[in-house]
C-alpha cells in the first residue's frame, strides 16, 4: 500500500531591515520610513535553508505602505576624468540655450548714446520746487513762540463770541422785569390817587 507523502518546498521572499535612520515619507510625511532588502530564499517545510537571489533595497513606509526604490550614493556617476567633466559641461550649455521664441536683446545704436551725452536729462538737474497752496512740513524746525498778548486777545474774543447768545437772553429778561416793575408802579399810583380822592370827598361832606 502506497502512502503519498507531501513535502512542501519552494522559493520565498524574505525581507530584512537594513538600518533605522530617520527618513521622511514623500506620501504621508511620516518620519518612520525603513530601509528594507527583500531576498529570495529556498524553503523546505516552511524553513529557509539558503539564499538563492539577492534582492534590491527599497524604502518602505509602515504607516501608508508606500514603497520607494533606493539608490546608494556609491552607484551615482562620478567624473574622475577631466574629459568627462568637459563633456558634461557642454551638455549643460546645450540644454540651457535659449529657445526659438526668445527675443534677442535689443542693441542700442551708438548715435543714440552720443545724443544722450549731449542732452542730459533736465529733470534730474532741476531742483524740486514747492507747489503753491501746500505747506512744507519740516519737523526739524524750532517750535513757534506765540505772543502772549495776542493769545489773550484771541481767547477774550472767542469767549465773547461764545457767550453772546447768553448775554442777549439775560438782556431780554432784564427788560421784561423792568416793564413789569413799571406796570406795577403805575397801578399803585392809580390806586393811591383813587383813595385820596375818596378821602377828600368824605371830608368835604362832613364839613357841610
From Swiss-Prot:
Residues 187-201 have a biased composition (Basic residues). InterPro entries: Zinc_ribbon_15. Residues 118-208 are annotated as: Disordered. Residues 118-134 have a biased composition (Low complexity). Residues 138-175 have a biased composition (Polar residues). PANTHER family: UPF0768 PROTEIN YBL029C-A (PTHR28139:SF1). This is Putative uncharacterized protein DDB_G0288303. It comes from Dictyostelium discoideum.
Amino acid at each position: 500500500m502506497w502512502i503519498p507523502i507531501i513535502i512542501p518546498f519552494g522559493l520565498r521572499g524574505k525581507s530584512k531591515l537594513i538600518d533605522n535612520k530617520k527618513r521622511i515619507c514623500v506620501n504621508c510625511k511620516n518620519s518612520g520610513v525603513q530601509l528594507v532588502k527583500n531576498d529570495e530564499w529556498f524553503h523546505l517545510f516552511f524553513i529557509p535553508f539558503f539564499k538563492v537571489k539577492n534582492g534590491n533595497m527599497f524604502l518602505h513606509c509602515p504607516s501608508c505602505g508606500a514603497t520607494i526604490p533606493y539608490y546608494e550614493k556609491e552607484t551615482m556617476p562620478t567624473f574622475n576624468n577631466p574629459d568627462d567633466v568637459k563633456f558634461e559641461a557642454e551638455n549643460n550649455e546645450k540644454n540651457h540655450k535659449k529657445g526659438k521664441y526668445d527675443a534677442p536683446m535689443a542693441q542700442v545704436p551708438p548715435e543714440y548714446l552720443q545724443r544722450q551725452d549731449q542732452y542730459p536729462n533736465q529733470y534730474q538737474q532741476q531742483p524740486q520746487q514747492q507747489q503753491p497752496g501746500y505747506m512744507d512740513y519740516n519737523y526739524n524746525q524750532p517750535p513757534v513762540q506765540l505772543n502772549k498778548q495776542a493769545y489773550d486777545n484771541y481767547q477774550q474774543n472767542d469767549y465773547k463770541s461764545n457767550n453772546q447768545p447768553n448775554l442777549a437772553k439775560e438782556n431780554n429778561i432784564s427788560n421784561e422785569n423792568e416793564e413789569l416793575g413799571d406796570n406795577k408802579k403805575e397801578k399803585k399810583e392809580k390806586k393811591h390817587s383813587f383813595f385820596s380822592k375818596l378821602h377828600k370827598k368824605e371830608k368835604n361832606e362832613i364839613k357841610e
